[in-house]
Design a protein with these regions (language model features):
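Glycoside hydrolase catalytic-domain context in secreted enzymes
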Residues: 1-229
């Protein structure tokens, strides 16, 4: 769409539609046969959030995605399609070593090629974005997400992260949007506890934890995810 067309569309959208575009839901809310129980069933979002949601996480399979997208487009007042996203971390249908293992290869070209193949497979399923690569400098083995990272070295994280972004996004017809995460310092969570706080000096933060992002951003990833600390 041209800019003036987007501006016109935005001016016609209701406040609820605009808010909905910033919301991501899991596929369970669009599953006709799903039975929501427990905390999920008790804390259902308002119906208009489901009606106007902007993206869906974790739905795999082109038939499922087509069904959800068709039903959603039919009822949406402006027929804005859902954006389907998933954690394509180290492969989609074809599985490769975890990022920590890929880092041991010291071969960014292979890492980029693996990401390109994963993007092609994901794109064929209807996915348009992945929450990868994770380039948090990881030095505490107690942290449960160490395997998603490229390890303890800022330079290796930066080089491999850039290579992976290039692989995901290099082909216009089969590529998917990459997302650098988590900006920044998330790998230094206290006691290795997920979602915990971080206590590091400004110098350490800038020289070690921000460095991979400075390097990988040169590949122009479509997205950057903030840290949870």
């Amino acid at each position: 769409m041209e800019i003036h067309e987007l501006q016109q569309l935005l001016s016609e959208m209701s406040l609820q539609e605009k808010i909905g575009q910033m919301v991501q839901l899991t596929g369970v809310y669009f599953d006709k046969e799903a039975v929501l129980t427990g905390v999920v069933g008790e804390q259902l979002p308002p119906e208009w959030i489901i009606q106007y949601a902007g993206s869906v996480l974790g739905v795999i399979g082109k038939d499922k995605i087509y069904d959800i997208q068709s039903r959603y487009m039919e009822q949406h007042p402006h027929h804005i399609p859902l954006l389907f996203m998933a954690d394509v971390i180290h492969g989609c249908r074809t599985i490769y070593p975890i990022p920590l293992g890929q880092a041991c290869s010291f071969h960014p070209e292979l890492v980029s090629e693996a990401a390109s193949i994963a993007a092609s497979e994901a794109s064929s399923e209807g996915l348009r974005a992945t929450f990868s690569p994770m380039i948090d400098v990881s030095r505490d083995p107690r942290w449960g997400r160490v395997m998603e990272s490229f390890g303890e070295d800022p330079y290796v994280n930066g080089i491999m992260g850039k290579a992976m972004v290039d692989g995901y996004q290099q082909k216009a017809d089969t590529g998917i949007a990459a997302c650098l995460k988590h900006f920044a310092g998330y790998g230094a969570v206290n006691a290795g506890r997920e979602y915990n706080d971080v206590e590091i000096s400004q110098r350490t933060f800038l020289e070690q934890y921000v460095k991979p992002f400075r390097m990988a951003l040169k590949a122009k990833p479509a997205m950057v995810m903030t840290a949870f600390n």
